[in-house]
Amino acid sequence: PANHPERYRIIYVPSVRLCAIQRWIHKNILSLLPSSCYSYAFDKNKSIKDCAERHMGCNWLIKVDVQNFFESITEDQVYFEFKKMGYAPLLSYELASLCTKERESPPYSKWTKYHYERVRTWNKIAQYQRTRKRFLPQGAPTSPLLSNLVMIPFDKKMGEIAQREGFVYTRYADDLYLSTANKNFNRKKALLIIKQIYDLLRAFKFKPNFAKTKISS
């Protein structure tokens, strides 16, 4: 229905000061890093056209949408991305905080639940204490490239599935595409592929948007 909540996207606009900081992080840190070879969104050297061209001449196309893509990416995932870049744990924590937004609800346990170095010490500092979970907000300048970084392991696994099944795989933000030129492929086999995609999404703490899954032939 037209008024269904999933038909709307919530865009979080950061304050002027925070936006300036996030733009700096985007320009001086995130934009310098390579993205997944399977990802075609948020990359100045790639486009939706390039993504579509990878599937030209296919006989079957499967499309799966990730539900609440940005909001499904958590502060701890962002923290580990900065840490993998070589930043110290505390600085990674600070950067992750700058790039994420606190959820309005529900409350959750503090950061002591996470196995971060020195996090128990940080929680003794008032401004580092957490009472609610944080997520990657759609609308922040840093969110697109951070989402691509977080998705690299997922893309790698999806690429392995695609290669094994004789498919081409691409991702454009929250849209996953798999195609094959195999004329002997059928809808029953497509449903088995989709199940593998759903299982992998769940393994990475994402949810598929069942209503947007499509099989085209």
Locations of the language-model features?
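Active-site-proximal segment of RNA-dependent polymerases
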Residues: L18-S72, T100
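Active-site flanking loop/helix segments enriched in acidic
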Residues: P5-Y8, R132
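A structured, charge-rich N-terminal accessory region that forms the first stable segment of a protein
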Residues: P1-A2
